[in-house]
Amino acid sequence: QPAGDGAHDDEDDHRGGRYRAIFISDIHLGTAGCQAQALLGFLKAHSSEHLYLVGDIVDGWQLRRRWYWPQSHNDVVQKLLRRARKGCKVVFIPGNHDEFARGFLGHEFGGIEVRDDAVHTTADGRRLWVTHGDYFDGVIQCAKWLAFLGDNLYEFTLKLNRYLNTLRARMGLPYWSLSAYLKHKVKSALNYVTDFEVAVAQAARAHGHDGVVCGHIHRAEMRDIQGTLYCNDGD
């Protein structure tokens, strides 16, 4: 369904098309592994009536340890603010890495609404629950110190990931996410990924929704779980 006239930036080319809604998560602005330029390219090429920022957009954990904020990260923030000013409805749903923003639920900043969760109605009338998903992660819920330890290891894999993909680019190979691969393998061994997906889908169904859009586990997915549409943004 075409987006309204005010839902795009004049400077953007929209070669990728316009959509009713776009969902992005786990950008981790403030880390060296953030793919800010790729995100800027995506946003310039795609516009939408609704833009859902489904958590971990800013990595507050890493910024507290070491400040890292290049111009490209600032450009992403400016792009999101400009998108809101141009008429796109932008909703920010904080995750565990940007949980500091949960202290501002119900407020708007530059036209961006901060909410704990949201419900998006699709063109065919289905109700999709939008939540980051960290509330369902046993690692976060049961042992937050373990999550912080895991975050240190995750930052290391991001650095390693950059070096590996530099080599892959020289070899003409496409981008590959080592961090997502390792997180998938480690958590799969502990049955976290499967348990997470099922738990989120069950919660969505229990609340009367037809599906759920989440992030958090850095594993892009779209599948049916016992009659409920489960969608994960990946990273």
Q: Language-model segments: what does each one mean?
A:
Residues 1, 15-20, 29-124:
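Core catalytic region of metal-dependent phosphoesterases/phosphodiesterases
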Residues 27-30, 136:
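Short histidine/acidic/glycine/proline-rich micro-motifs that form metal-
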Residues 4-13:
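Intrinsically disordered, low-complexity, charge-rich segments with an acidic bias
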Residues 110-116, 129, 134, 138-148, ...:
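Conserved beta-sheet core of the metallophosphoesterase superfamily
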Residues 26, 55-56, 95, 132, ...:
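Active-site glycine-centered loops adjacent to acidic/histidine catalytic or metal-binding residues
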Residues 131-196:
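Active-site-proximal loop/helix segment associated with metal-binding centers of metalloenzymes
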Residues 60-84, 167-172, 178-212:
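N-terminal short leaders/motifs
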Residues 21-23, 51-53, 129, 213:
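Residue-level marker for buried hydrophobic side chains located in beta-strands
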